From Swiss-Prot:
The non-natural D-maurocalcin (a chiral analog of maurocalcin composed of D-amino acids) completely loses the ability to stimulate [3H]ryanodine binding and calcium release. Its protease resistance, combined with its efficient cell penetration at concentrations devoid of cell toxicity, suggests that it should be an excellent vector for in vivo applications. The presence of a 'disulfide through disulfide knot' structurally defines this protein as a knottin. The record marks 8 as: Important for stimulation of [3H]ryanodine binding to RYR. InterPro entries: Scorpion_calcine. Its main location: secreted. This is Maurocalcin. Keywords: Calcium channel impairing toxin, Disulfide bond, Ion channel impairing toxin, Knottin, Neurotoxin, Ryanodine-sensitive calcium-release channel impairing toxin, Secreted, Toxin. Belongs to the scorpion calcin family.
Length: 33
């Protein structure tokens, strides 16, 4: 699945983010921020 033009795809969880997809602290999985 692709994301809308103004959204970015978080490859780790295939989620569409309005912001960056990045890790939080010691968490391994990336999340929409």
């Amino acid at each position: 699945g692709d994301c809308l033009p103004h959204l970015k795809l978080c490859k780790e969880n295939k989620d569409c983010c309005s912001k960056k997809c990045k890790r939080r602290g010691t968490n391994i999985e990336k999340r929409c921020r």
